[in-house]
């Protein structure tokens, strides 16, 4: 059966920012079928550089897939912008599933 993904977004940790890096992660869990697309936007503009997607094997219990999409930036790049958005397109929804956060509210 088709399963709609659960999407969550996580800002970089304070520890990571202290060391000069910034990784934003979008978790997309328990979806089926496997065909899925994740798009990153920074302040509304699509960001393709520094993105790494990793899909897990099918879950043995419910046959769904999960994936993480990681956006890697430097701390300087990260602090230059405010709105970070992860958009997930899957056949279970006619419109993208969108999760975002404002850096100045973290």
Curated annotation (Swiss-Prot):
A biological-process GO annotation: adaptive immune response
Keywords per UniProt: Disulfide bond, Immunoglobulin domain
Disulphide bridges: 26-86
Pfam family, any one: C1-set
SMART domains xref list: IGc1
Top-level taxon of origin: Eukaryota
InterPro entries, sorted: Ig-like_dom, Ig-like_dom_sf, Ig-like_fold, Ig/MHC_CS, Ig_C1-set, Immune_Resp_Modulators
This protein's record includes keyword Disulfide bond: yes
Domain Ig-like: 5-102
Positions of transmembrane segments: none
GO CC terms, sorted: alpha-beta T cell receptor complex; IgG immunoglobulin complex
Record Gene3D superfamilies: Immunoglobulins (2.60.40.10)
PANTHER family attached to this UniProt entry: TAPASIN
Name of protein: Ig kappa chain C region, A allele
Taxonomic path: Eukaryota, Metazoa, Chordata, Craniata, Vertebrata
């Amino acid at each position: 059966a088709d399963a709609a993904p659960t999407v969550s977004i996580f800002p970089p940790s304070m520890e990571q920012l202290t060391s000069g890096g910034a990784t934003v992660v979008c978790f997309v869990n328990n979806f089926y079928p496997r065909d899925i697309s994740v798009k990153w936007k920074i302040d509304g503009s699509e960001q393709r550089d520094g993105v790494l997607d990793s899909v897990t094997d099918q879950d043995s219990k419910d046959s769904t897939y999960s994936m993480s999409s990681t956006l890697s930036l430097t701390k300087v790049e990260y602090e230059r912008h405010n709105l970070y958005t992860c958009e997930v397109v899957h056949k279970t929804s006619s419109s993208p599933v969108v999760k975002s956060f404002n850096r100045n509210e973290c």
